[in-house]
Amino acid sequence: MQLSWKDIPTVAPANDLLDIVLNRTQRKTPTVIRPGFKITRIRAFYMRKVKYTGEGFVEKFEDILKGFPNINDVHPFHRDLMDTLYEKNHYKISLAAISRAKSLVEQVARDYVRLLKFGQSLFQCKQLKRAALGRMATIVKKLRDPLAYLEQVRQHIGRLPSIDPNTRTLLICGYPNVGKSSFLRCITKSDVDVQPYAFTTKSLYVGHFDYKYLRFQAIDTPGILDRPTEEMNNIEMQSIYAIAHLRSCVLYFMDLSEQCGFTIEAQVKLFHSIKPLFANKSVMVVINKTDIIRPEDLDEERAQLLESVKEVPGVEIMTSSCQLEENVMEVRNKACEKLLASRIENKLKSQSRINNVLNKIHVAQPQARDDVKRTPFIPESVKNLKKYDPEDPNRRKLARDIEAENGGAGVFNVNLKDKYLLEDDEWKNDIMPEILDGKNVYDFLDPEIAAKLQALEEEEEKLENEGFYNSDDEEEIYDGFEASEVDDIKEKAAWIRNRQKTMIAEARNRKSLKNKAIMPRSKLTKSFGKMEEHMSTLGHDMSALQDKQNRAARKNRYVERGSDVVFGDQDALTASTENGVKLRQTDRLLDGVADGSMRSKADRMAKMERRERNRHAKQGESDRHNAVSLSKHLFSGKRGVGKTDFR
């Protein structure tokens, strides 16, 4: 059950609510649309605007409706308190207006979205959007008064104290200025304003304290005047509703000195007037300000008026003085005891709860099947068992005794293998590895392992004697193959393995190239020797081809003549060109440069030329691109004050 409403969201005024929702629509939805776009795109653009705006208003209204409490679902005390403070009908009408506006906005959004689906042009869709947003704005503007009222209620309801109607409560009531707030300050840490004039307390104040490890709350109520309920104001009605609805111990305070401004007769009359509200409650009358006058000092007439209060059944009278802090804690403790006793009594009176518990309890008892008495059986060995006597020299030694004989704790080391059950007691302390040669020893343990090993060795010896492992034909190495065939197979297998290795190496070389250039097969140099070796491996006879190559070489052989000596350079150049040998290429960067100093000067000049291009971010001498002079992200936009982004 909710006891406080401090987390209700702020209720914005009507104009502010309009600005919030419309600005969010402008920021969260697209803003560029042109007549040249497809009509489906234009319709979707404006339908999105209408839907988003309607959802924004509906969301704000739902937050308001969910934040405020439903006055029909709260405790009767809170319901009557809210009725007194905020006028229940006014509160309901305001929330109903918000709920009605929510449904109207939803209806407007649906109707205009349906119309926008048949819009024929941008202008028509835009006018429909304006009409939809205008109708929503009109609906919201009509909520100016309900929204302002709900904001005031939110601010006030958030400051109300958290009062639990069902917990242990001490309720302090009485005429104004009789010492109620002073008593609350004495028994709790509540900082209540105390003044020497009436009606200082205008609302309910709550303080908490502990008694017997239980949490109690004490409520200070505003002063009550003796007049009909219809004539009471909101301040007095808060006290009346607290007395009527809260399960508490009522402390009715009286001032016999009459410094509060009311006579003893009026105070007694008020007690009898509100006596019907004390039904099923513990009541105590507290005579306060005994430092000024005590009950014994009253005259006979006033004493009789005070005695009339005792005639009410269950009412006790106690005295206290908040000024001197006399009997304050005794009054508090007595009230707490009465409250606890009454709560326990009320629980016992509610038979339904007791019956619910009794219905869940069932005590089952076994039924006798015959008249035979079955006494417990105790073996004779147990009966004859002697009680352990530490002084008996023939007693059975315990592990504790053995430890004491061998030096005590910290000196004696317990042998954990002493209780092993083995064939030979000498095996108990043998070292047995758990892991041997990387294997778990326990996986190979077998009680008959020696016998199995001997049987296996005998079987192997028998097979060797029978010649099971000997070959029938020493010349026949493999079934169905002669020795020559086996050699041929091995040779071919070796060639296949070498070929596979070569293919793998070539594939790896191709992968390792990645983005590097690969030399085409047609450009690779091929020698006759490599071709001859390759063809020989394939089983071809290359002798005839070798003779033909030798004859062609002798025919084209060059013989030096006398003229070659004179024109040697030119002929050598011609011969080398004819044979297909490439000329050595020269570095053209060095052409036209006389020496190293000229070369360094040329480098410096080239560097200076590149500096200007780099400053303008040019790609080279041929780059003629002109960049924009104004940055779009800095200079584009509809307004110049920096409030709106470019559209």
From Swiss-Prot:
PROSITE patterns: G_OBG (PS51710). Residues 168-340 form the OBG-type G domain. GTP binds at residues 174-181, 220-224, 288-291. Residues 594-647 are annotated as: Disordered. It is found in: Nucleus, Nucleolus. Residues 598-626 have a biased composition (Basic and acidic residues). GO terms for cellular component: cytoplasm; nucleolus; preribosome, large subunit precursor. The modification Phosphoserine is found at S563. InterPro entries: G_OBG, GTP-bd, NOG1, NOG1_N, NOG1_Rossman_fold_dom, NOG_C, P-loop_NTPase. Keywords: GTP-binding, Nucleotide-binding, Nucleus, Phosphoprotein, Ribosome biogenesis. The keyword Nucleus applies. CDD domains: NOG (cd01897). GO terms for biological process: assembly of large subunit precursor of preribosome; ribosomal large subunit biogenesis; ribosomal subunit export from nucleus; rRNA processing. GO terms for molecular function: GTP binding; GTPase activity; RNA binding. Belongs to the TRAFAC class OBG-HflX-like GTPase superfamily. OBG GTPase family. NOG subfamily. Associated with nucleolar and cytoplasmic pre-60S particles. Directly interacts with RLP24. PANTHER family: NUCLEOLAR GTP-BINDING PROTEIN 1. Involved in the biogenesis of the 60S ribosomal subunit. Present with 28000 molecules/cell in log phase SD medium. This is Nucleolar GTP-binding protein 1.
